[in-house]
């Protein structure tokens, strides 16, 4: 399936999701609970609504920056490595066991914040590096996979990650797989 068709299908699905809600989205006031602190991760992109929505349909990209976004041709030119304005910030985070991680989507597109064993491809083959590389197991079959569906972040939403055990945990966006970070739990 061509990249344009894959993204168009995702766009249609995402428009439906925006209208109906999602799994795994939490409303959090940013307070610490009895177990630890809340550490924030910001999920960012800078899509240009005119070119993204023109190609894939309304709602795929919202103008959240109020300024000029990255036009779709520039985004596509950055593939397969991925565009640097699509990222998790910070790229690494050190927390204490018992802390909660709050991933907040401040970008214009929908993303996932999915824990993976190893970094690799997402569920849109044309966005992988190398192109058409297989998805990592946690990202296979897109939103039909509960690991993906439960970690979906629509624009403006947040997701809480709790009970991380000691060690290094890897998170990636299953749509834009160059969006990656590591969380070290001490």
Where are these regions (language model features)?
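Short intrinsically disordered, low-complexity segments
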Residues: 6, 17-19, 98
């Amino acid at each position: 399936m061509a990249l344009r068709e894959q993204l168009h299908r995702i766009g249609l699905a995402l428009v439906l999701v925006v209208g109906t809600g999602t799994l795994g989205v939490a409303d959090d006031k940013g307070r610490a609970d009895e177990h630890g602190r809340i550490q924030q991760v910001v999920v960012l992109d800078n899509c240009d609504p005119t070119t993204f929505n023109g190609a894939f349909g309304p709602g795929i990209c919202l103008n959240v920056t109020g300024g000029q976004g990255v036009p779709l041709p520039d985004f596509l030119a950055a593939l397969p490595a991925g565009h640097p304005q699509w990222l998790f910030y910070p790229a690494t985070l050190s927390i204490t066991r018992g802390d909660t991680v709050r991933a907040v989507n401040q970008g214009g597109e929908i993303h996932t914040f999915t824990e993976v064993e190893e970094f690799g491809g997402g569920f849109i083959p044309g966005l992988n590096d190398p192109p058409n590389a297989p998805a990592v197991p946690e990202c296979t079959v897109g939103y039909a996979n509960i690991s993906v569906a439960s970690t979906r972040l629509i624009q403006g939403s947040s997701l809480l990650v709790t009970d991380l055990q000691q060690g290094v945990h890897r998170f990636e966006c299953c749509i834009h797989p160059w969006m990656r970070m590591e969380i070290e739990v001490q």
